[in-house]
């Protein structure tokens, strides 16, 4: 398969046969998976081998990676800093060179946040294209309305490879739909329109981050892309954030 012989790790929240799946929750300390979850099966069928599982915060609900079962995962670039969360163990393992491929999950940044903190690649796919079956504490529960599963890696090419392995309907859905992801339809940066949103009063970032994002936009403009520093999506960020919080807690 496309991952023949590749060793990898995976977020603790995925089910691997005969291994603990606790989500960092003491109530599930002895929760042992009876079988591989769907994502794990697909990786195995593609040829991958699992070395182990990576750390998470309690119930996958934080932007750090500590729980009372496994302890704390720190950022391999600076052990006094956090790796992000909730896929913090995934990103830390990649950044440390311990693994070359990972899978995490994301609602409000749980793949993207640790990928950013640790300097690796992460992708939050469109909801539904990767089944959540097997990313669960209790089997056969309905999929979350907000959460998605997705890959982390050390390059964009590896993200695509992992996404191709993970994506597609589960068996119970396969009669109803199939996945046909389009290929990228541009050949050069000159064909791209880029909007740069470097900070916002609803979610301000540090000056260092704002400056670096602006530099990226300026570089893309020099390379021929059509770049706007003023364009914004047609919605109110404050309302969107409030609506998200209501959905998250519902």
Name these PLM-found stretches:
Residues 1-108, 218, 223:
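Gly/Ser-rich catalytic/binding loops embedded in alpha/beta enzyme cores
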Residues 36, 120, 210-214:
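Amphipathic alpha-helical segments in well-structured domains
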Residues 42, 158-161, 211-212:
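Short, solvent-exposed alpha-helical surface patches in well-structured domains
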Residues 19-23, 52, 140-143, 195-199:
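Short beta-strands and strand-loop turn motifs
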Residues 58-60, 110-111, 204, 237:
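Generic structural signal for helix capping and beta-alpha/helix-loop junctions
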Residues 75-87, 127-137, 250:
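Short, basic, helix/turn surface patches
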Residues 64, 70, 91-191, 195-197:
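Fold-level recognition of mixed alpha/beta catalytic cores in primary-metabolism enzymes, strongest
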């Amino acid at each position: 398969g496309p991952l023949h012989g590749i060793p990898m790790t995976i977020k603790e929240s995925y089910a691997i046969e005969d291994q603990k799946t606790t989500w960092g929750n003491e109530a599930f300390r002895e929760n042992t998976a009876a079988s591989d979850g769907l994502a794990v099966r697909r990786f195995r069928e593609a040829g991958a081998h699992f070395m182990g599982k990576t750390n998470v915060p309690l119930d996958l609900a934080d932007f750090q990676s500590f729980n009372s079962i496994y302890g704390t995962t720190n950022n391999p670039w600076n052990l006094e800093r956090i790796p992000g969360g909730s896929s913090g163990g995934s990103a830390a393992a990649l950044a440390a060179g311990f693994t070359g491929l990972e899978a995490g999950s994301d609602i409000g940044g749980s793949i993207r946040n640790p990928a950013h903190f640790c300097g690796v690649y992460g992708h939050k796919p469109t909801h539904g294209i990767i089944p959540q079956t097997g990313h669960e504490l209790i089997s056969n529960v309905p999929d979350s309305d907000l959460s998605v599963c997705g890959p982390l890696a050390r390059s964009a090419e590896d993200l695509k490879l992992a996404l191709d392995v993970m994506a597609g309907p589960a068996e119970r859905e396969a009669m109803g739909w199939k996945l046909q992801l389009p290929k990228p339809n541009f050949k050069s940066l000159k064909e791209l329109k880029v909007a740069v949103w470097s900070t916002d009063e609803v979610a301000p970032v540090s000056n260092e981050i704002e400056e670096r994002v602006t530099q990226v936009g300026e570089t893309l403009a020099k390379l021929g892309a059509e770049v706007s520093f003023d364009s914004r999506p047609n919605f109110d960020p404050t309302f969107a954030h409030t609506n998200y919080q209501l959905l998250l807690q519902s």
